[in-house]
């Protein structure tokens, strides 16, 4: 996939993170990501969640998903769309319950928040609401 190596940025939008992880494995994309250290991965919703080790059962929607495991390229999990209007299940209380079950470091972030990972440096960039869980 030469075009992939020529890309400066990959924008990966939402959906189901387990489905996305499945097809990233099937297509071989998961093996290409580490060979592209200069390429910026911009994940939106499931596009970010797919890079984490787990998404938690709360976010698994794909019926064929064997579990809640995703790619584990970063070492933390993400609860997206915190306090999103019209999504009554995405509260901070739900995020705390989710984080207690995830078994590792995690972040709950709203739609005005991003997490950057450069090498081993993780930073939160936000004009909104977020919380870090260290479990």
Task: Please name every model-derived segment.
Residues 4-5:
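A short, aliphatic-rich alpha-helical micro-motif
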Residues 9, 55-135:
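C-terminal and late-domain segments of enzyme folds
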Residues 12-88:
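Class I SAM-dependent methyltransferase SAM-binding "motif I" and its flanking Rossmann-like core
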